[in-house]
């Protein structure tokens, strides 16, 4: 875990190093021409090994995939966000004391599964992972247009189907978006207990205006809005969640989320923000509140409009570039926000090797 002041100091040093360097950043394709291009554009990550105090788990990936003693992390694999996913994985491995005890469950569309798995193996040769196919037809007919096209991607809804996509032997998982980096030991997040019958845990933001996540049509319909009558719902970001998959399956929460999507699609427009509102409708007011340090979100701002964001006060364990702006896009354009320099040391794109080259100088901080 890093304090806000420590991250600020690190940020100043990174910025100083980069601004005085002799190199220039070449123009980079955001979307590679092929998956082979994506693989060749990425460097192999350093090898990370368990510390002496780590439990010895199965070396066989098939066995580790079902081992409840392992830390299980689920992420989507979207070619457009592959660079972000790779950086997120890199940050997790770098900051955990037991990297060999982590198993990654990646979800990809059927057309890209094999190529993406090959890319991951080349970047992380010793990584324990499995790539699952998400059939986009499962949810495509339930998606209604939102305020941002990126939110309409079927893969964005895969988080609602983890209990069905992942092997039934997986009873608990951490779900992470692709635009995060972890600067603390992920085992701390994994060990958080979900009290009572709660199915998910996430940082909760009760100061946010909860009503804005739904339309006037929703709030004026007593039958629909009564879902919150016995609760005190608060906003939470679905980009970082600890999920009890056994409780999820028992509660059949995927169907409950789908039911709200059907109302949105077939009856009346009750929300505008893609996959988030159905989660709020089903779980709002009934989640395990996790410390805010595990999702310093909303840092994306905008790639085009100058709207850089700053870290929130307090300790930081996970930094999340949610929103339109992504650090790799701004860095490539030569117009980064200061916060983007905290993402850069985990970037494994070959054009960014300078950040990795100087990263050792930052270890003393």
Swiss-Prot record:
GO CC, one annotated term: Golgi membrane
Main location: Golgi
Enzyme Commission number(s): 2.4.1.-
InterPro entries listed in its UniProt record: Glyco_trans_8 (IPR002495), Glycosyltrans_8_dom-fam (IPR050748), Nucleotide-diphossugar_trans (IPR029044)
Keywords in alphabetical order: Cell wall biogenesis/degradation, Glycoprotein, Glycosyltransferase, Golgi apparatus, Membrane, Signal-anchor, Transferase, Transmembrane, Transmembrane helix
Induction: By methylviologen (MV), a superoxide radical generating drug.
Biological process annotations from GO: cell wall organization; pectin biosynthetic process; response to oxidative stress
Lumenal-facing ranges: 32-365
Cytoplasmic-side positions: 1-10
One example GO MF annotation: polygalacturonate 4-alpha-galacturonosyltransferase activity
Subcellular compartments: Golgi apparatus membrane
One Pfam family of this chain: Glyco_transf_8
Keyword Transmembrane helix assigned: yes
Disulfide partners: none
Superkingdom, natural source: Eukaryota
Pathway linked to the protein: Glycan metabolism; pectin biosynthesis
Family, per entry: Belongs to the glycosyltransferase 8 family.
The protein's name in its UniProt record: Probable galacturonosyltransferase-like 10
Native source species: Arabidopsis thaliana
Gene: GATL10
């Amino acid at each position: 875990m890093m304090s806000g002041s420590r991250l600020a100091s690190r940020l100043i040093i990174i910025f100083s190093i980069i601004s005085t360097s002799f190199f220039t950043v070449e123009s980079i394709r955001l979307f590679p021409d092929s998956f082979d291009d994506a693989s060749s554009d990425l460097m192999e990550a350093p090898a990370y090994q368990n510390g002496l105090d780590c439990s010895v788990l199965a070396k066989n990936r098939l066995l580790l995939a079902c081992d409840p003693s392992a830390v299980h992390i689920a992420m989507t694999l979207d070619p457009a966000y592959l660079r972000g996913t790779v950086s997120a994985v890199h940050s997790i491995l770098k900051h955990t004391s037991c990297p060999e005890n982590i198993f990654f469950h990646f979800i990809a569309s059927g057309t890209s599964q094999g190529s993406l798995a090959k890319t991951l193996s080349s970047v992380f040769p010793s990584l324990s992972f499995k790539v699952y196919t998400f059939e986009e037809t499962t949810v495509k007919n339930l998606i209604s247009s939102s305020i941002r096209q990126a939110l309409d991607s079927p893969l964005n809804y895969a988080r609602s189907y983890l209990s069905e996509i992942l092997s039934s032997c997986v009873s608990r998982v951490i779900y992470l978006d692709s635009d995060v980096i972890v600067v603390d030991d992920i085992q701390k997040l994994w060990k958080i207990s979900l009290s009572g019958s709660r199915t998910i845990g996430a940082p909760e933001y009760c100061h946010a205006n909860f009503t804005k996540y739904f339309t006037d049509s929703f709030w004026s319909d007593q039958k629909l809005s009564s879902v919150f009558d016995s609760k005190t719902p608060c906003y939470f970001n679905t980009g970082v969640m600890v999920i009890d998959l056994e409780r999820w399956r028992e509660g059949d929460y995927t169907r409950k989320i789908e039911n709200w999507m059907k109302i949105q699609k077939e009856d009346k427009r009750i929300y505008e923000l893609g996959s988030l509102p159905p989660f709020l409708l089903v779980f709002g007011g009934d989640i395990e509140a996790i410390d805010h340090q595990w999702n310093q979100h909303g840092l994306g701002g905008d790639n085009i409009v100058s709207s850089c964001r700053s870290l929130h006060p307090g300790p930081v364990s996970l930094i999340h570039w949610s929103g339109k702006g992504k650090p790799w896009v701004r860095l490539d354009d030569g117009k980064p926000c200061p916060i983007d320099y905290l993402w850069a040391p985990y970037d494994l794109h070959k054009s960014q090797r300078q950040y990795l080259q100087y990263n050792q100088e930052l270890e003393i901080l």
